[in-house]
Amino acid sequence: GFAAALQAAGLHALRFTFPYIEAGRRMPGPAAHALLTWRAVTAAARQRGNGPVVACGKSYGGRMASMAAAEEPGLDVAGLAYLGYPLHPPGKPEKPRIEHLPAVAQPQLFVEGTNDPFVQPLAQLEEAVASCQSARIAWIDGGGHSFEVKGRKQAPAEIGASLAPLVAEFVRGIA
């Protein structure tokens, strides 16, 4: 999967599960809890001393990392990579979740599927990324929110492994 492919590329990956998931809940609860989790995880990663720390999160995890980075004090990371950033709830582009993104000082990589309902219309994400200090998008042609492509049968681990080189290149570019 994704973490194994990062490790094969010479990067260290520290995986975690948010407490609400550990508790068996479907809904995340207060964002403050997720922000505290990100702070604890990045502190643990820094203690390992394996080079710069880059926060990488899927969907909600990425959005929470971006919110933690935008706060004062920001998240102590060299950069942030988002896999399927949830720009807005599906079908509700009038409710964007972007107001904090320009406050993120670190480089940001948005890995997004062109068929992801969380980023339609695509121009809305492009505008949000243009408002950021240092950010870019890596589009996955035909990819949905979990990067699945209609008509192409791929296991989640295979999809994750295919995304890792994009993130590895980003990390090497900021390290």
What spans do the regions from the language model cover?
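Catalytic active-site module of serine/aspartate enzymes centered on a nucleophile-bearing elbow/loop
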Residues: 143, 151-175
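Acidic catalytic loop of the alpha/beta-hydrolase fold
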Residues: 115-119, 145-146
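Serine-hydrolase catalytic machinery in alpha/beta-hydrolase-like enzymes
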Residues: 1-53, 147-155
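The serine-hydrolase catalytic nucleophile loop
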Residues: 1, 121-122
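Catalytic histidine neighborhood in serine/cysteine hydrolases
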Residues: 14, 130-148
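Primarily recognizes the serine-hydrolase "nucleophile elbow" in alpha/beta-hydrolase
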Residues: 38-106
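Short beta-strand/loop motif that positions the catalytic acidic residue
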Residues: 104, 110-112, 116
